Amino acid sequence: YCHYQGGSDCVALYLRENPQSRFFSGKGLILGGSRAQNPFGKAYCGDLSAILIQNINPLINLIRVPSKKIALMSEWDTKLEAIAESTIDRDITNLSGVPSWFLVLIKHILKKTGRQNLTEVWPNLEVFFHGGISFAPYREQYRELISNPDMHYVETYNASEGFFAVQNDLSVAGMLLLIDLGIF
């Protein structure tokens, strides 16, 4: 529950701060990990992001890419190519995932399209919700790869144990603790 509510809170806080947003005019690209069936039973195990995608509200599937089949692939290179193929011609307005994983995907997409920056591929891209690792070492690379001066980067603090905080004011580096998600 807390991860889905935390994700909803991220979007709500972003939209409150950016009422001119065109967030819902396109699709959200969620890049998650992989999962596999437990060899000892019917339960699935794997990266939290994959388990969340597997069980996501069906309505969210209307506004996100790639398909579950692609998103849950376990072989990274195959998954990378499938995501690129299925999203290059889509209207992507937002990204969600781990900065290091997305960096690999972005570079793959740029190489595949022959474009210099991601704004040429997805001109309506406006926000990247990121977490899992510090964004600081990647910030400059992202600024070079996404030339849109109005691009927003929203930091989140989530882990397997729960969804703890989100950057609610993009002008400061701090995050808002999400104390109503059953964690504290």
Label each region the model flagged.
Residues 1-183:
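Active-site phosphate/ATP/adenylate-binding loop shared across adenylate-forming ligases
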